[in-house]
Amino acid sequence: MLASGGLDSAVLVAVLARRQRVHPVYVRCGLAWERAEEAALGRFLRALGAARRRDVAPLVRLELPVAPLYGRRHWSLSGRGVPGARAALASNYLPGRNLLLGSLAAVYCARARIPALALALLGDNPFPDATPAFLRDFGRCASRALGAPIRVRAPFRRLAKEAVIRLGRDLPLELTLSCARPRAGRHCGKCTKCAERRTAFARAGVADPTSYAGGRRE
């Protein structure tokens, strides 16, 4: 499955690994937050492994630089002009990101003879490359192109982020990272992603264990 250091994919790894072997794949694109995100994912996976209750394969890292597509001045690459807490969710959209990441992961699945690719997409994701139609068409296209059946799954497609938090409330969610401008590995507390995270914990009725810059937890 495509994995990041964020809440959604971390919980999905844990849920799927209760009943099957999961092969987490992280794709490095050169985005400003990736170093902190990948470190967070590593910590979370190690914590799962220490619990010895889930079957998770070693993390696979792939490379797909997006600077030629977005330009090095784009906020996602430069870290400057990151959408703030009050910005619309659409301001976070990175054109074709799920298509790009999914394509690379699908090739890996085909070569490794893994028949399914899981994505941690949520029901309130408004972007065109997160719709049921996209997932269906992408699965068909990938299977045809690779000559191998690839089932593209989105188990959380009907859930909101607060439901995912409730589902994973017994997991070490403090190890996850959902931030577009992390500071020394911590959430900045000011970007759209941090705002979304705070709101989701509040709606879930679960204490937010996140360490935000400035030392504040909510």
Report each predicted region and the residues it spans.
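ATP-dependent adenylation/nucleotidyltransferase module used to activate substrates
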Residues: M1-L171
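Iron-sulfur (Fe-S) cluster-binding segments and ferredoxin-like electron-carrier domains
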Residues: R183-R186, T192-R217
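A polyampholytic, Gly/Pro-enriched intrinsically disordered region
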Residues: R86, L171-L177, E196-F201
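Short clusters of hydrophobic/aromatic residues that line enzyme substrate/ligand-binding pockets
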Residues: L69-Y70, W75-L77, C179, F201, ...
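Immediate flanking context of iron-sulfur cluster ligation sites
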Residues: R169-G189
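Short alpha-helix boundary/capping motifs
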Residues: F44, D137, C191-R197
